[in-house]
Amino acid sequence: MFNRFKRALIGRPLTNKAIKNEKYGVIWGLPILSSDAISSVAYAGEEILLVLLPAIGFMAYKNLLYISAAIISLLLILTFSYIQTIENYPNGGGAYIVASDNLGKIAGVVAGAALSVDYILTVAVSVSSGVDQITSAFLFLRPYSILICIAIVLILMIGNLRGIRESSRIFGVPTYAFVFGIVAMLIAGIVKIKGGYVPPTTPLKAVEPVTLFLLLRAFSNGCSALTGVEAVSNAVPNFKEPSVKRAITVLILLSSIVLISFGGISVLISMYHITAGDKAVIIQLANEIFGRGFMFYYITATTFIILVMASNTAYSGFPLLLAIMAKEGHMPRQLNKRGDRLSYSNGIILLSVLATVLIVAFRANVTSLIGLYAIGVFISFTLSQTGMAKRWITTRSKNWFIKAIINGTGAIVTAIVVIIVGITKFREGAWIVIIVIPVLVFMMLKINKHYRAVAVQLRVSPEDLQCIKISENHYRNRVIVPIESINKASIRALRYARTISEHVIAFNVSIDEESGEKIKKRYAMLNTDIPLIVKYSPFRRIVEPLLKFIESEEYNYKKGDMITVILPQFVVRKRWHNILHNKTRVYIEKELLKHKHIVVATMPLQLHDDDDIEDKCKKEQ
């Protein structure tokens, strides 16, 4: 039943050969990878105003344009840098691969950890922001914000579990719809002003002077418009061939849309003197330009959808990033395994769970989540820019000096943003990210250390392979079958034990002499020459008496012998039946596996369905 439900939810399994059909081109690659960056324009200008308006009043609008121009300049630098990254690192991984290759393993892990945190926050911020936009238009939905967010994350998870191709179709159309709405609003807004419309003005007084630190704070807030630019470089392997060419085309289109949308909205905010308040800035603009007509609701709906879809960029990048890191040994190997629909399903589920935890913990509050946002992605920006600058200096390829200057400038600017965000948003939540990233780096390095240690212990050199003779009897095998009672499962285990060794014993641990005598009498009825050893354990311990017996002279165990412990097991038909039976076998297996001379095997006995047995009993009566 579970499998049928799973198939209905995410579709039938796909073969490995179908992976080529799961890749996307420019038309669908653009919306699925650009939704994060494009959606940022819906709130980036608002984040700048939240810093400037309370401090310098009406002067905020003029400074908003200057700050927007600076952010657009940084966008162009990042675009150039990531084009070079795509050309030089076509296997994906973005900042993680660039930093690892040029700055060393630790720098790469820091970039990977920072980018992972940013992807998780992208889902939490985008979904919360989208719900905030829709509840700004429909206030009666405000009390249900958290539940709506959780439902949306669940839908996103299911959509992405269905595979890359299907998710690109599902989540692609809203991006184009949003871009159309924004362009229409930009044109209509400018035409309306040129036609003589005078927007209402709210008196706003400055309460403090324009300082460099104030402008830097506003700049760092507005840099949220740049989040998502790195997504294309992380997902190059998801493109159809020629993947590099298609990825670069998507990146250029993405940057062009962000430039026009973000720059245009900043101009409209200044023209219409929009304030940052209870209602989202983009909703206020739509209301001012179109009134409460069709286009107002169109902008509201597409803004909500694009903000939600922005998180789909994370669903494209996060699982792939973790898969690459898992392949390198910095994350659990399970994250490098594709699911039934050829998506990295474990990464998708992990992202959904972590994003949901954040949404619930911060009660879907965008302002609180924004405090954590951006610092992670700008750390990865800085490391990526620094890595590319070093690459040009090292390789000295064509135009290397100009490229190094551009990347070096980008590295300095993004590093400044990291410092500003870290300082200005420390109390707002940035401290959490500042702590979490080093913890993640430590965890990833420990994981890598473990995998390397395992590899060293398992490695067999070609020279050793030629000397090993598996045909020889390397071990003398002795078998022990622990039995709790004499039943079909234990008898089946004893029969199997006899087929693999002549040295077999049955072993029972009883809590008192009375129960021990009972099992001895019942075992005596069994037609077998396998001896039964009964040990008493008044403290109800099970494994200790068995291990003590193995090491005793009574057992006559010799160094070099291998002991196979066969555990009888019955397998129930329904999963919930498992909770009705104790897990003694699991505990015994766990403890015995700590000893290198002991092999643990299970002998299963499949039980029939309860209803079938009940019907059989009724017939026999």
Give residue spans per PLM region.
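Loop-to-transmembrane helix boundary motifs in multi-pass membrane proteins
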Residues: 105, 145-150, 240-260, 326-360, ...
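Helix-loop-helix junctions that connect adjacent transmembrane segments
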Residues: 176, 181-227, 424, 428, ...
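Hydrophobic alpha-helical segments and their helix-loop junctions in multi-pass secondary transporters
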Residues: 177-203, 265-272, 382-397, 446-455
